[in-house]
């Protein structure tokens, strides 16, 4: 068994003073206050988690022509797998790990109406098979982005209504096949319809076996998505919402139980659908009661700066503990990995970050980083 001590320990649910953390193998065996053995660190937190990124797809030190966030061959690629394009030799992974961001959800970009499957990964793994933890939904995009890439191949929309017409048509076709399949099963005769690879994914969405992770910034695009939710019964997570500047949108999402992965903060409002982007919009988010997490959208902002963006949540009134929970416990819950990550508790992975001081102080940095029980980074 190994142990460390923390003058201050953020568990992801509470703050403990003079605490001890113990683990055996990759699992925590005890977390609590009291005397213990092992090195003493000023502050210890759970491993940080980025809930939405393109790390390993748009890679540090490589030309843009080699980026793989968006496949250009068609606007509907539900059966694409983001894991097939992630390259673990991206220098961004090392920088993230050194900053305490050990886990990330990687998604296809937002140029396509549906871009493919996501992957929750270990940033410190040597290859993508070892990196993969689980899937966290199929990437889709509403709003400006799918209509902004008209020069790409395939059927490309020129308007929002064109993009959603393509998606609606595909979902209708698969829903009709599901009805045919049910009729054949009920009668016990006839031939059940066959599903293509793309239709198999859409079928899983209609059956709520898969979540749809939807890029959307503006309130009216959120409204359009909610119409789809009502029409097709989809299970969705809303990504971004940086242009939403009213409380009603978030209150409706809260009432419907639809979570938001907010961000990225600290980036240029580089398009019209971000004209109302402002960190002060966070007040609407945090006061609404909606379940939310936080992203970097790496490389839109670098993943290693994830914790720095929490300062805006402090500005709107959150405590340091509550802010840290966004990129630990809350992100883990949205991604479906809260059984092993997000909080420091007995039975969970021994993945944590030991800091030189208060993580919110500019001079502080990780001095030791543990991933599933192993020391993977240490500063001299």
What are these regions (language model features)?
Residues 82, 178-278, 333-335, 356, ...:
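Active-site core of metal-dependent hydrolases
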Residues 60-61, 67-73, 77, 254, ...:
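His/Asp/Glu-enriched, well-ordered alpha-helical/loop segment
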């Amino acid at each position: 068994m190994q142990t460390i001590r923390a003058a201050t320990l953020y568990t992801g649910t509470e703050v403990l003073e003079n605490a001890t953390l113990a683990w055996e193998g990759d699992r925590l065996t005890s977390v609590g206050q009291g005397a213990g053995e092992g090195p003493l660190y000023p502050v210890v937190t759970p491993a940080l988690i980025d809930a939405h990124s393109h790390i390993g797809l748009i890679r540090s030190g490589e030309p843009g022509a080699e980026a793989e966030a968006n496949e250009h061959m068609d606007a509907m690629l539900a059966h694409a797998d983001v894991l097939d394009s992630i390259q673990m030799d991206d220098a961004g992974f090392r920088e993230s790990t050194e900053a305490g961001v050990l886990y990330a959800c990687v998604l296809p970009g937002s140029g396509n109406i549906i871009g493919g499957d996501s992957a929750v990964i270990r940033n410190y793994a040597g290859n993508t098979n070892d990196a993969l933890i689980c899937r966290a939904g199929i990437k889709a995009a509403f709003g400006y982005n799918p209509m902004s890439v008209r020069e790409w191949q395939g059927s490309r929309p020129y308007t929002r209504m064109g993009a959603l017409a393509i998606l609606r048509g595909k979902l209708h076709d698969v829903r009709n096949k599901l009805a045919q399949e049910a009729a054949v099963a009920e009668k016990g005769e006839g031939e059940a319809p066959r599903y293509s690879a793309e239709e198999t994914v859409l079928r899983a969405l209609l059956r709520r076996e898969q979540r749809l992770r939807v890029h959307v910034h503006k309130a009216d695009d959120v409204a359009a998505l909610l119409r789809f939710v009502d029409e097709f019964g989809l299970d969705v997570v809303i990504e971004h919402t940086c242009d939403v500047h009213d409380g009603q949108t978030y209150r409706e999402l809260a009432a419907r139980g639809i979570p938001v992965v907010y961000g990225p903060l600290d980036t240029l409002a580089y398009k019209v659908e971000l004209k109302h982007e402002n960190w002060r919009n966070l007040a609407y988010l945090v006061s609404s009661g909606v379940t939310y997490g936080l992203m970097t959208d790496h490389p839109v902002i670098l993943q290693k700066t994830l914790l720095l963006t929490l300062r805006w949540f402090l500005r709107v009134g959150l405590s340091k503990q509550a802010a840290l929970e966004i990129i630990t416990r809350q992100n883990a819950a949205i991604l479906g990995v809260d059984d092993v990550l997000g909080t420091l508790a007995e039975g969970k992975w021994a993945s944590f970050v030991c800091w030189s001081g208060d993580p919110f102080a500019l001079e502080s940095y990780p001095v030791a980083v543990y991933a599933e029980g192993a020391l993977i980074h240490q500063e001299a």
